[in-house]
């Protein structure tokens, strides 16, 4: 495997099994530093209670070798170049009217994601607000 372990700056919970605490995740090496920057930014800009209430500690996954839901192309998760946050409250087909991550409380989080080379499918297409994936610039070392 070419994946690397990222030690989390704050504990996260599996979104589908909230009693399970995780302290590290597997990611593609090209995005480890930038995702680490994002998570440290979350820790610096939000209190522990805010992180919990906003679901920024609810890990929806990075590496999952599978095709995209309803499609034949491989998911970005197949290469561990994407991460999902709080899938229960930011569901795949929900638009910004329902998804929480579009709310102003998440501005610093979304800003940190963009500043570190991650793309929000919610911001691009108004669905799958939980999902943030590495930009081409980040993947190919053109920036960051």
Regions found by a protein language model. Name each.
Residues 7, 13, 43, 60-62, ...:
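Generic intrinsically disordered, low-complexity segments enriched for polar/acidic and small residues
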Residues 69-144:
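Catalytic cores and adjacent binding grooves of peptidoglycan-active enzymes
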Residues 1-55:
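Active-site acidic/histidine clusters and adjacent loop/turn architecture
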Residues 39-81:
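Active-site-adjacent loop/helix surface patches within enzyme catalytic domains
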Residues 5, 11, 41, 58-60, ...:
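Alpha-helical structural elements
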